[in-house]
Amino acid sequence: MYTLHTKRVKAAARQMWTSNLSKVRQSLKNVYHKCKIRHQDSTGYPTVTSDDCNQDDDSYDGKMNLPVVLQDVKTAQVELFSQMTDIVHMIPKVQEKTDLYQKQMEVLETRMNVNEDKQCTTTKDILSMKEDIKALKKKVTELEIQNSCSTIHCLEILEGERGKEITELLYKLIQPATLKNTLASTDMEISSAEPEKVPSYPKSTDHLEKKTISPQMKTLKKRNHQNASRSFEKAKPNIYIYPDFSTWIKLTFVHGGKWTFFLSATKLEEFIQWLLSRPTILPEEPQVITQRYCPFTGPILSLTTICLSIFNNIYGFICSLKEEVTRL
């Protein structure tokens, strides 16, 4: 804007200068022509007539007009000088404004460069983010494929012979645990029943002991066998099926002990069919081990319970004291 303004001012000054110069030149030319005509008139010697008198009057008027013309030239020069001074005073102001606008333009250019750099960085970040998103999508698809075609790490029921072998091994592992638990329960019952029913004889022979214990042992064997069959009837597997069928299914079997298995939803039907096809085998009759009654078992047990209760009370008291100290 200010460059255009300066150009316009310069053009106006040139026009004024040229117009004033043209006026001065025209006035000078007129004066020169008049002087030349007067000089030609003065060189000749014509006869004096009325026309000559008129010419003399005109020359006198020309002489009188010369100072007026010069005065006009001076005034025009003064005006031109004042206008030129005004233009000269205006030029530094315009220059200052142009400098200010140039500085502002430089600041704007720097800001534009900064914005361009930011845009470049943002575009680079966006491109890197797009690449990361693509890589993540690929990984997600790979994980989905792996989940769809994955193998079971906890327990894998395979098709064919290997699956059958693994299930048989699991069944064999479950059976000894159930037998151990039933044996432990029978031992506890025998130890609790013997001191009540079997009388303590002072130093009796082995033959008499066998005769006295044999009917009791038979009854205990029958009872244990019945209890074991009842426990097998009562112990039913708890099947927890999650709502999402793509997830694993937790099976807990309570046969004397908790056995948990994780199966896929696709293999659940095969596992249930295998369980239904297997015959229900009752555990073998446990071997009863005779234990002699000790008269010191009762007081020893009572003393141990008393000591444990005292220890628990002391421990609880110490814990409560620690909590109070920490609060304080």
UniProtKB/Swiss-Prot annotation:
Keyword annotations: Coiled coil, Phosphoprotein
Coiled-coil regions listed in the entry? 93-151
Q: Which residues carry this modification: Phosphothreonine?
A: T182
Q: Does the keyword Transport apply?
A: no
- Look up the domain of life of the source: Eukaryota
Q: What is this protein called?
A: Coiled-coil domain-containing protein 54
